[in-house]
């Protein structure tokens, strides 16, 4: 896919993090005059030294995205963050560095993009943030059946097409816990002001309330192309050919409180945020190991 994208978009430089695939990528692209680099260190080095980066979009899986993100921020770049783990593990550092280096942070996660969009043009303090959650594939699964679920079931999300790791996190609601931590740092909001709502339709992606009782919601059909494009074209909006919300067919929107006894990882994530320090970083590391073990069917 990387080779295909590089050719289709006529790029000048390609960095492949997986060293095992470096030679294969180079064999295909070097004859076309494309400079190919290998290894995660090369990604960070390129970001740190390149003079032709207009916008940096970090979409690496897990904690590996932290160093490239910090490299872009230290350059004062506009950084669109698509992977939440760096913000979960080092949100305070990221936002402090962004302020010091006058870097712009654009959230790509659908919920945080929704909050960001709702805040455009607003100068009043936030009263509350409402983070919506679809509830994942096991929303209506009895608790006693959860220990029997398969990998195939856990990565079959009812609303979103995503990578395996984030889909498993969505199944356990750990993803939503991470998003609460992320929102705390991205928008400088006290944890108790961030509420999670289970919203199975996934039409409202987040809401922001203000001191006068107003609530601003961002809505669209569940499609990641919208928040991705918004980050790439910000502050402009460009036409996007995705299905529009049909309120007549939709009929109703539902909201429920998350069941923390059924989905304890959300509770653990909220506790980690309250505890602070390096606790969210430890939680992120433990979760990455556990999810990988689950995907390899070594744990249930």
Feature annotation, model-predicted:
Residues 1-300:
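Catalytic, metal-anchored helix/loop core of enzyme active sites in primary metabolism
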